[in-house]
């Protein structure tokens, strides 16, 4: 006999599940009962299940149960079909939602309750009295809840509980006191755009399935190229899954530009290629070289000065060394806003060297690209207009929700030639519209998420001036922090001088270490301070800031600010909290 749910009236089974006491039978009858309107279905379900028979998640402790949606409605229709009518999620499953027959009412109610959960989380994210994180160790979370996937479906009441539980233990990255990563903040327009994008649920490979999004990508990338300084916004570009992939795109295109035959014949057809980047650059350059078969040994790290900027004379020296060995320099990746120090390489000097030796110049402005929106700070990227390609991540300094990373290329058509494969089932050549808007073939991906809409909608809502105010405020907050701690007892700066970006790097020195000479023992003990304070931050949930060693410098705090919700008071709180958590070390 068919199992419950396999047919409209099929509820029994060979194993005795036709017994009215059996929960599987009750669920099957309940699905039929939900076809009735006016609350009758829910009442029948309640009789079938009984309070003791409601499905419950097995294993582990349970979060508080969500209350069933029991709203009143004034439509005066009998029976009532509007979303405000009573819906009891304990007796509903995903199969009762659209596209199920009569699934509109439970669908609207369910999504409204999900929205309520999300909106409560949004409000809490900006509430300074709430924790940034409710930290639990991995084994605690694994033991406390049953996260395993089951063969049988759970009801919608439990699904809502999973939503609540997930957010309960999520990091509030929009919290004004979350300073841990380069991507922070929670923009309301960007959030709304992301919801819309998920609702549209389309792919970016052709105009026919994403007409508006493809046009918005064209408009937005052109505007970004104009801001970089390429005449008329000429060139090409694409949104990618992140800065690491954007940097790999640049490496891929630079290699193709110099040796187009590599596309068909592979690395065996080309000489030993060498890329150059600073010792403070992002690790993604080496990852890209590994993925493309170039090899990490073929990425030469150029020395930096004490502020983390590439030294041009060392770049030229290493280029000449590579050429003397018979290798072929094909790419220099300069960084505009390094991950740790927030340093900006001297782009004009790097551009001169690249021009002299005919090498592709890439600028990794994933972190620093946002400063191009500020008239006060864009000078730090002087020379970016001479680059052949630029990585720019609006999901970092501009506060666009993750993910939103762009790779901009100065030469139009090069990306298409490098990556296109002419898949005839997608990119037919006899379509009835302009095929230049079928942009998917220039991407490495086939399935590509719509990342542009949140940036475009935020830009429309804020204007360029709004982004400028955002950038200027964050840099002012970084300067405020620097001015407070540079001469404050118990703090030592990692490098001298005002930071160029919002990165403020410092050591907190507890009272017990302040009396020690600056020797190996002191450095060894100091290296343990930041990790302990960070652990205490997370366990208390009050704030979060990152730390790391770099070169010969032991663990230090790296404070970054990209959330415009932060204030001077939040900076003051951070300083006081570090001192409170570290004074006994």
Swiss-Prot record:
Pfam families: Pyridoxal_deC. A lipid is attached at residues 30, 45 (S-palmitoyl cysteine). Its EC number is 4.1.1.15. The keyword Cytoplasm applies. Residues 1-24 are annotated as: Disordered. It catalyses: L-glutamate + H(+) = 4-aminobutanoate + CO2. GO terms for cellular component: cell projection; cytoplasm; cytoplasmic vesicle; cytosol; Golgi membrane; presynaptic membrane. Its main location: cytoplasm. PROSITE patterns: DDC_GAD_HDC_YDC. Phosphorylated; which does not affect kinetic parameters or subcellular location. It comes from the Eukaryota. The modification Phosphoserine is found at residues 3, 6, 10, 13. Keywords: Cell membrane, Cell projection, Cytoplasm, Cytoplasmic vesicle, Decarboxylase, Golgi apparatus, Lipoprotein, Lyase, Membrane, Neurotransmitter biosynthesis, Palmitate, Phosphoprotein, Pyridoxal phosphate, Synapse. Belongs to the group II decarboxylase family. Homodimer. Catalyzes the production of GABA. This is Glutamate decarboxylase 2.
